A protein has these predicted regions:
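C-terminal core of ALDH-fold dehydrogenases
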Residues: 323-430
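Conserved small-residue-rich beta-alpha loop and adjacent elements
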Residues: 109-174
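N-terminal Rossmann-like NAD(P)+-binding subdomain of aldehyde/semialdehyde dehydrogenases
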Residues: 1-125
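A glycine- and small/hydrophobic-rich beta-loop-beta segment
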Residues: 262, 270-346
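Conserved NAD(P)+-binding/catalytic subdomain of aldehyde/semialdehyde dehydrogenases
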Residues: 180-251, 255-258, 262-267
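Short internal beta-strands
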Residues: 155-164, 268-275, 281, 352
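Short acidic-hydrophobic, aromatic-tinged amphipathic segments that line or gate anion-handling sites
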Residues: 2-9, 183-188, 308-313
Length: 430
């Protein structure tokens, strides 16, 4: 189970464990299998999709079952408890309003010759969203991935999600209805990613694929990247906490367990300056564990990938966090804003005693699709920017052309590109 560590050597050994966990997709034994599945879908289209869906999800599956009709989606929405619908719609509204703040505006500048140079933003036309199904059916995944695409203005949003013996989770379909997804297909796994990337007779090729999934989905996204854009290769979920003597140990314990229950490789790490508070947190972790529904998962994730780390001061905790670049970071101290100013690497930051990470997972508004496995050093949370393209433009006047002509002619000649030089020179001679 979860333990407290404070020796430098123990901390470094723990970091080694986390680093090895981060490389799980690189060394996976399933790489060849996923590559074969993707090639099969590329070459055989719908036939391959049907065969794999029969093999993995539903032995009675037929091609006519692949698309979920608008009527079935609406029926699912109407079948869901009204209070659940209220919650889903409230979550949609909050997520939508937050992402509206990310919308970019075109801009331009003009130089002394009247030359105009600028940037324009256009939405990606077609996006595919992967939503896990079966036991790991997460309606929040629909909202968090679809809403920013809607805000960006994507014309076509296609959702794929695997069914269990032909049956889809009605709450997942209700979210698709609320978010106005254009097409829903009951397929999953690497074959679904390949279908979105390459297209089949039934499923149109998309320009970008987003959404989480298991190791097969992650490897498939890596396999098709280049034929299509992707969001990222998601690893196991993780949280780091920075706490001092003011922390509420009950809250901290609950938040560590909330993260650890995601899956067996999930990581929950608390950096804390008080040994006494660390022991209190551990006491509540053990107490709350007894009432958890997912004890098997918790046991493995707490044993393998989680620790309470006692540090000499807050600055040491900050150093460790910046090194790990966690997906989620909770700062539960007397001065959380001051500490956040020193954080360089984190996917999303939750400030203060009352900002539970679970609020962000569902209803707060910012996106819960975040960089994992240390990639917060160079990746960001999913947002509107992930669904738009930035193009530059330039309009040069006759005077502007003359001003640039000689220098560009000489620059191109320097590089040995004589036709570039001619193109510039001709305009300067008018």
């Amino acid at each position: 189970m979860l333990e407290i560590i404070e020796k430098e050597n123990d901390i470094e050994q723990f970091f080694d464990v986390l680093n090895k966990r981060s490389n799980m997709t690189k060394n996976s034994k399933f790489v060849e299998t996923v590559s074969q599945i993707c090639d099969d879908v590329l070459n055989n289209g719908d036939d391959a999709l049907v065969n794999y869906t029969k093999k993995f999800d539903d032995p009675n599956f037929e091609l006519k079952d692949i698309e979920v009709s608008k009527e079935e989606i609406k029926k699912a929405y109407l079948s869901v408890d009204k209070n659940i619908i209220r919650i889903l719609e409230e979550a949609y509204d909050r997520i939508y309003k937050f992402h509206l703040t990310q919308v970019r505006k075109d801009y331009s500048i003009k130089d002394e010759y009247g030359t105009i140079m600028g940037v324009r933003y256009t939405p990606i036309e077609s996006v595919g969203v992967y939503v896990p199904g079966g036991k790991a059916a997460y309606p929040s995944t629909v909202l968090m991935n679809v809403v920013p695409a809607k805000v960006a203005g994507c014309e076509n949003i296609t959702m794929v999600t695997p069914a269990t013996k032909g049956v889809l989770n009605p709450i997942v379909l209700a979210c698709a209805y609320i978010a106005k997804v254009d097409h829903v297909y009951r397929i999953g796994g690497a074959q679904a990613i390949a279908a979105l990337a390459y297209g089949t007779k039934t499923i149109k090729k998309v320009n970008k694929i987003v959404g989480p999934g298991n190791i097969f989905v992650a490897l498939a996204k890596r396999e098709v990247y280049g034929s299509v854009g992707i969001d990222s290769i998601a690893g196991p979920s993780e949280v780091c906490m920075i706490c001092d003597e003011t922390v509420n140990p009950k809250y901290a314990a609950a938040d560590l367990l909330a993260q650890a229950e995601h899956d067996e490789m999930a990581s929950a790490t608390c950096f804390i300056t008080s040994k006494e508070k660390a022991e209190e947190i551990l006491k509540y972790v053990n107490e709350f564990y007894n009432s958890a529904a997912r004890k098997d998962i918790l046991t493995k994730s707490l044993n393998n990938c989680s620790k309470i780390v006692v540090v000499k001061d807050i600055n040491k905790a900050i150093d460790y966090v910046n090194r790990l670049a966690p997906e989620h970071l909770e700062i539960d101290t007397k001065d959380p804003m001051d500490i956040m100013a020193k954080i360089k690497n984190a996917g999303s930051v939750f400030l203060g005693t009352y900002s539970a990470e679970s609020f962000g997972d569902y209803m707060m508004g910012p996106n819960h699709v975040l960089p994992t496995s240390g990639t917060a050093k160079y990746f960001s949370a999913l947002g509107v920017d992930d669904f738009i393209k930035r193009s530059t433009f330039q309009y040069t006047t006759k005077e502007g052309a003359k001003a640039l002509s000689n220098d560009v002619n000489d620059f191109a000649t320097l590089e040995g590109l004589t036709m570039h030089a001619l193109s510039a020179k001709l305009r300067g001679e008018e």
